[in-house]
């Protein structure tokens, strides 16, 4: 109920004002008027996954000095071993020139129209042992087996009658001794089918035997890992002492006396 001194409309207005003040946002009371206070909201950054977003350039900058230091460390180790009488070598150094010559000749003989059989034969012919075995098999088949196919280049083969020639072509002999013929038969012209289409590679006569690097006198292999090898060469003074001992022992054995060791000589000199 409303108080007695106040009218009902005044009480209703006061109630509406109080309810609006409670439900409205914060306002600043000022003589100029009421202005709403700005609300401050704080946003927390969401955690992002930085595992995949790294910096690979920093890793490269760190790896390059590491490899550089490792190379210098290896050179230092080889230098120290060389001072102590060891020798660090690789087996691939001796065959560098031979491999270059073989690659040049193979590149010259390779043709774009080479078939699969020619490539297989080329890979087989790279091994000298296969070449020798194949040559021996061809000789055995030509000499021992009377039913083996006879090629025009085989010694003792009957003359082959040339086939029909086109006008303007002079007949000639079949001269292709630079490769092996697997199938014998009449030849139409002065070249065979493979020579005409250039489907056969030249066979390189390999008579030389691969000889390893000649070892020095007194050279002993200490460590061998793959192609890396560490050898030790004895000083020349020890070799001269051994030679002198061998010469002395040889003269003593000729005279019929037992060779005396250096220890016994020192004992006899002290007595």
From Swiss-Prot:
Residues 231-244 have a biased composition (Basic and acidic residues). Residues 79-271 are cytoplasmic. Keywords: Cell membrane, Membrane, Phosphoprotein, Signal, Transmembrane, Transmembrane helix. Its main location: membrane. Residues 27-52, 144-168, 231-271 are annotated as: Disordered. It is a single-pass type I membrane protein. The chain crosses the membrane at residues 58-78. One of its GO terms (cellular component) is plasma membrane. It comes from the Eukaryota. Residues 155-165 have a biased composition (Pro residues). Residues 36-52 have a biased composition (Low complexity). The modification Phosphoserine is found at residues 109, 114, 244, 247. Belongs to the RELT family. Interacts with RELT, RELL2, OXSR1 and PLSCR1. This is RELT-like protein 1. The gene is RELL1.
């Amino acid at each position: 109920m409303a108080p007695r001194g106040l009218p009902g409309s005044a009480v209703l207005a006061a109630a509406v004002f109080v309810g609006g003040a409670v439900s409205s946002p914060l306002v600043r009371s000022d003589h100029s008027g009421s202005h709403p206070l700005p609300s401050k909201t704080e946003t927390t950054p969401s955690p992002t996954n930085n595992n995949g977003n790294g910096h690979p350039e920093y890793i490269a900058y760190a790896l390059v000095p590491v490899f550089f230091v490792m190379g210098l460390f290896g050179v230092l180790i080889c230098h120290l071993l060389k001072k102590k009488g060891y020798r660090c070598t690789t087996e691939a150094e001796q065959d560098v020139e031979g491999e270059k010559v073989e690659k040049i000749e193979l590149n010259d003989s390779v043709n774009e129209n080479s078939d699969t059989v020619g490539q297989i034969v080329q890979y087989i012919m790279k091994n000298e042992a296969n070449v020798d075995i194949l040559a021996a098999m061809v000789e055995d088949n030509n000499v021992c087996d009377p039913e083996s196919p006879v090629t025009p280049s085989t010694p003792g083969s009957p003359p082959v009658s040339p086939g029909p020639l086109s006008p303007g072509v002079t007949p000639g002999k079949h001269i292709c001794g630079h490769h092996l013929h697997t199938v014998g038969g009449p030849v139409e012209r002065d070249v065979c089918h493979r020579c005409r289409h250039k489907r056969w590679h030249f066979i390189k006569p390999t008579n030389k035997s691969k000889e390893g690097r000649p070892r020095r006198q007194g050279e002993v292999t200490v460590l061998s890992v793959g192609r890396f090898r560490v050898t030790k060469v004895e000083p020349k003074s020890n070799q001269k002492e051994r030679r002198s001992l061998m010469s002395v022992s040889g003269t003593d054995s000729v005279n019929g006396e037992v060779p005396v060791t250096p220890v016994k000589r020192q004992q006899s000199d002290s007595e």
